[in-house]
Amino acid sequence: MSAIFEILDKDAGGRIGKLRTPHGVVETPTVMPVINPNIQLISPKEMRSFGAEILITNSYIIYRKEELRTVALEKGLHELLGFDGPIMTDSGSFQLSVYGSVEVTNEEILGFQEKIGSDIIVPLDIPTPPDVHFRRAEEELATTAERLEAARKFIQSKQLLAGPVQGSTYPELREKAASHLKDLNFEVYPLGAVVPLMESYRYAELVDVIAASKKGLSPTSPVHLFGAGHPMMFALAVALGCDLFDSAAYALYAKDGRYITSNGTYHLEKLNYLPCSCPVCSRYTAEELRKAKNKEELLGRHNLYATFAEIRLIKQSIKDGKLLELVEQRCRAHPKLLDGLKRLYTHSAWLEQFDPATKGTYFYCGPESASRPEVLRFGKRLERFSIEGSAIIRTSPVKGEKDYDRILTFKAPFGTFPAEMEEVYPFNAEVPKFPDYEALSTSLSNTIKLMDLNPGAEFTFICEKEFQHPLIEEIGKKAKLVYREAWKKE
Amino acid sequence: MSAIFEILDKDAGGRIGKLRTPHGVVETPTVMPVINPNIQLISPKEMRSFGAEILITNSYIIYRKEELRTVALEKGLHELLGFDGPIMTDSGSFQLSVYGSVEVTNEEILGFQEKIGSDIIVPLDIPTPPDVHFRRAEEELATTAERLEAARKFIQSKQLLAGPVQGSTYPELREKAASHLKDLNFEVYPLGAVVPLMESYRYAELVDVIAASKKGLSPTSPVHLFGAGHPMMFALAVALGCDLFDSAAYALYAKDGRYITSNGTYHLEKLNYLPCSCPVCSRYTAEELRKAKNKEELLGRHNLYATFAEIRLIKQSIKDGKLLELVEQRCRAHPKLLDGLKRLYTHSAWLEQFDPATKGTYFYCGPESASRPEVLRFGKRLERFSIEGSAIIRTSPVKGEKDYDRILTFKAPFGTFPAEMEEVYPFNAEVPKFPDYEALSTSLSNTIKLMDLNPGAEFTFICEKEFQHPLIEEIGKKAKLVYREAWKKE
């Protein structure tokens, strides 16, 4: 197993990994451009120039169309598409979800994918949509489980086999399904039937679905967020531990005149300017692009450039330990993404176990930053600071502080820690001049906790007049509370 | 005057304008790439391909160097640089600020700029740095004023004359200087000596300097934030009413191996990936770029692509009425920019007069969004809602609400308004599911104000359990307060 997916770098739940397939190694996180075997807006072999390392296509479409099927069986999938790198194939589950039935069995489509040389084979699972009755979700999950067990027995080649996690919008079902599949040792775990959540901007629920599935899986397994192709939510999904995405969006959106950016979608018809630096947008004006004969192709190219630039930014952010800063910025693009961000941090206790102990300087980006894993971790380890005697707590040096036994620094959103640690991660954090309410909530709570842990010490708290928070009163009960202005006069 | 600068679109303090110069019309906001007359990383004539519409160069350097001076005087500035579009010239003020003196008088350098055919002429003002004594700032400002008055008398051609606003970090001096210059009718107003503020990330003070200067100037005059070339802070500066920037950064940063993005700067040496979609970054890997023979030039090109893409995004955001959403997102790039954002909204009452009455859907991006001009405006006009009889306030429909005389909607960060206006701007706002503390502060205050304005009405407030805020108690004193859960059971 470990030979197939290797994790090289980590930040929050995100990671940079190497996925080994029969046709080569793929660096994750990445997006697989969806190739329609019938119509190609941009040829598969050109995909590498945008940054694609792996493609995905639909084996059911190939299976159903005589001329495609014959070529695929005779010359192989890679020759059919004209791409010699890794190719994943879908099974017809999507068609099943749209039309209610497909004209192929699980074994038939598995065998077909194996024969044509797919690098990642997907069984014919049941994609249960969001919001169905629990009973239906459970029943369909049982069918999916049977088919996946059969698939695991059926596929024994070097080709990778995907084990899709279903369970609708029931986190408990997703987690249960995931832990069951974990024991069957699939090589890749797609999270299925999440497209309707993304289409209706239900990012908070999407976060719960991903987190629940991840909790059931081994953290060392690669996870594919099936159907996710909009770069706007890649950072959020990567932070939760998704490694693979697939984009039909680049082409479908281009067909509709939709222009993808990492902050959302524009309609080309409504653009006065092309707000992007890609080769297409640097060369054409919005007006020229609208009138171009190959408008759809150019738009598809722009969409791919924008998509892969976001992947590179995400990978760089993981390297720099800045993934959550990126997530917090991206999630400002839409209030529903902000809901997703807030939901992400309800899982901070779980995320914390993956988050590196030391990383790039913490940047405070907003109230949600107060709930990041490293802030939580700080609050859980306050007992390591043992304080005795007289202790002064202040945001920055004050007169006469050397008369105290201990000098402590207060810094939101963390709390109170020994002044000598100011330059140490995470206390070297870059924070705004005056903390938000939420940052004060965390840091004042942690300060109260520290005081409670050290009942023998005598605390003096130098308060800033900008600290407007009900917990200040609480601090006043446990410490001598002096406002900075009054202190100066003492 | 109005013929020289025409404002076409507005959003917050930002605008899209047309600046007419002897060598053509420039659409603002825009950046003027700085051309060093001695060394050119990228040739002036190529600048158009990146999106540049106007260049800036230093007339003092040309004046001081025999061979440049001769060509400029004989063939003109435009022939010297090989660019037939608008060119602004600096006067030597920068050299004055660095070396303490220059070997030219105000009249000499003005006359020289006029003769060589500069499109925007800059007098030899005194760039007073931040943090000097008030006395010095005042004295230098007096000298600057004299020189600008002389310049205004001296330059009477069709060439545009710039009147730089100085005053160090004293907002009152900046505003005073600006109102004085307003009466002298310059065509362009640079805000001078702000580079040290930007270099040390003092964005909050920069905001105050810009706002103070703008308050003194006519809102119809074009403003140039002299020395600002990093795209990270363009959106913030544009929202305050800056129209022109100049970038030496694209070349200076390239020389140092620094890679510009709209979210900050990377060192090429430390990049594993190129997190951008521009023609350079789509073609090269980080490793290849580091090893390229023309690394500096390629990096300069990337820096220009990134810079002008941000300008296009800003212009599109103004068109869409989404400039403040962009500002709020960009200001997450660094906590000091977040300080700048918070400071921006301390000027909301002033910004509100420029902000269109109706624009694109309001997106809530964080606590600062609660202080946007449109939220402030709503709070100032509560008297237009006259409420009588029984009134129910709720976030979404509840049972039995039709028994009330008036049905009102509560939506943070705004407050309470008639339910029939839910789909009207700004109440059609996209907001997170649960409001932040700051959003509750604004909306609950406005609700209390509405109740006070309508003492005859009987209010019932259906409260959500997620609303944790001290003002809820206040609401309880003025209205019947019922939690949604309890209401269901009634």
UniProtKB/Swiss-Prot annotation, chains A, B:
UniProt entry tagged with the keyword Transferase: yes
EC number, UniProt record: 2.4.2.48
Q: How is the cofactor bound?
A: Binds 1 zinc ion per subunit.
Record-listed substrate binding positions? 125, 193
Q: Which InterPro entries match?
A: ArchSynthase1/Queuine_TRR (IPR050076), TGT-like_sf (IPR036511), TgtA (IPR004804), tRNA_ribo_trans-like (IPR002616)
User: What GO biological process terms are annotated to this protein in UniProt?
Assistant: tRNA wobble guanine modification
Key words, A-Z = Glycosyltransferase, Metal-binding, Transferase, tRNA processing, Zinc
Detail which positions bind Zn(2+): 276, 278, 281
Is this entry keyworded Isomerase?
no
Catalysed reactions, as listed in the record: guanosine(15) in tRNA + 7-cyano-7-deazaguanine = 7-cyano-7-carbaguanosine(15) in tRNA + guanine
The active site of this protein is located at 90 (nucleophile)
Q: In which pathway does it act?
A: tRNA modification; archaeosine-tRNA biosynthesis
Q: Which cofactor does it need?
A: Zn(2+)
**How is this protein annotated for GO cellular component?**
cytoplasm
Pfam families per the UniProt record, alphabetical: TGT
Q: Which GO terms describe its molecular function?
A: pentosyltransferase activity; zinc ion binding
Q: Look up the domain of life of the source.
A: Archaea
**What does the function comment of this entry state?**
Exchanges the guanine residue with 7-cyano-7-deazaguanine (preQ0) at position 15 in the dihydrouridine loop (D-loop) of archaeal tRNAs.
Q: Which family does it belong to?
A: Belongs to the archaeosine tRNA-ribosyltransferase family.
Q: What is this protein called?
A: tRNA-guanine(15) transglycosylase
Q: Which gene encodes it?
A: tgtA
